[in-house]
């Protein structure tokens, strides 16, 4: 119709009243369970059936890393813990279905399989509270440890060279 709608200008700034920020606990809201691999909160890993993601702390920075079936381990992000955890969680949700997340959560109440126990170190086999999911996370880390270290150390070196 060709009518020109005029935007009313105002000198008032759009100030917010009663604004409150709330921290969201991504670990609790995730479709996957995040395992603290070594009990020091510096290495967390979640696993599905086809993919896994982890966040690892090195020299003051967090690194988000992911793996998918037979694809190479990849760097997902570098930065603060919450940001890396969000990146890793998002990536894992993109790779896995909701059904896989729910099936893997069932493993939180099941004992490790004999096959899992065979590959775990003696101290993990002696942990009678260990679940099938925790065993899966530990084994995922064990089988991908060198690739994870390579990706994290390369990213750390790049950061140091840029600084």
Predicted segments, located by residue:
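Polar/charged alpha-helical tracts
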Residues: 83-86, 90-94, 126, 153-157, ...
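Long, largely alpha-helical accessory region at the distal end of helicase-like NTP-driven motors
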Residues: 1-107, 114-119
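Basic helix-extension-helix modules of the SAP/HeH family
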Residues: 105-160
């Amino acid at each position: 119709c060709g009518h020109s709608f005029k935007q009313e200008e105002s000198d008032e700034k759009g100030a917010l009243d009663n604004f409150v920020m709330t921290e969201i606990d991504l670990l609790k809201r995730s479709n996957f369970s995040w395992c603290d691999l070594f009990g020091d909160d510096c290495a967390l890993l979640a696993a599905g059936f086809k993919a896994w993601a982890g966040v690892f702390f090195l020299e003051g920075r967090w690194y988000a890393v992911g793996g998918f079936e037979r694809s190479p381990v990849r760097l997902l992000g570098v930065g603060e813990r919450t940001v890396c955890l969000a990146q890793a969680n998002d990536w894992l949700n993109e790779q896995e279905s909701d059904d896989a997340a729910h099936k893997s959560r069932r493993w939180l109440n099941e004992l490790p399989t004999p096959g899992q126990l065979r590959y775990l170190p003696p101290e993990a086999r002696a942990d009678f509270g260990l679940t099938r999911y925790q065993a899966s996370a530990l084994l995922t880390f064990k089988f991908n440890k060198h690739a994870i270290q390579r990706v994290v150390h390369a990213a750390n070196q790049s950061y140091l060279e840029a600084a």
